[in-house]
Amino acid sequence: KKPGALRGKAAKTFATKVKSEMAFLNMPNVELVPYFEKCEPNSNGTDKMELLISANPGETPRPVAKIASGGELSRMMLAIKTVLASTDTVDTLIFDEVDTGISGSAAEKVGLKLREVSKSSQVLCVTHQAQIAALADYHYLIRKQVEKGRTFTNVTLLDHNGRAGELARIIG
C-alpha cells in the first residue's frame, strides 16, 4: 500500500479511538473526521492531516481551533493523550483547568481518565473540581497573594487532613 493510504487508515482508526474516549468524557455526540490535504513533499510525506470536529449533532465538522470551547479542547487533548499513552514518550502532561465548563459527573470521568493516563506519564492538573482533585495521588494547594503591591504564588503539598479540608472547601 502507498504511505498515503496507510496514513488514511491509521487516521480513521485513531479518530475512532479518540471518539470512544470522548464519549466516556461525556461528549457522546462528537464526530471526528481526519482531513488530508496535499502539501510539498517533506520528511513527513506529501500530505498533511487536520482533525475536524463536530461537537454537536447536525453540525458540519470543522477545524478544532475554530469551534471547540476550552473545556472541549481540554477533554479532546485528554482523549488523545489516553489513546497515545502506550506509545507517547512525553514524561509530563500538564492540564490547566481541564474541568472548565463541565458537570460533576463529567468531572469524575475526567478524573478517572487523568488517573489512567498517570500510569504512563506524570500528570499535573490544575482543577477547581473536587471530583478530580479527590482522585489525585498528591494534592497541592496553590494560592496567590498580594504583598506590597506584588503578586506571589504559594504552593503547598497537603497532608491527609489538609486535603480533606480543601476538598470540603471546594465542594462548598
Task: List each model region and its residues.
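Walker B catalytic acidic pair
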Residues: 96-97
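Conserved D-loop-proximal element of ABC-family nucleotide-binding domains
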Residues: 87-88, 100-108
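GG-anchored amphipathic helix commonly corresponding to the ABC/SMC/Rad50 NBD signature/C-loop
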Residues: 51, 55-57, 71-93, 117
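C-terminal lobe/lid and adjacent interdomain/linker elements of RecA-like ASCE P-loop ATPase modules
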Residues: 105-172
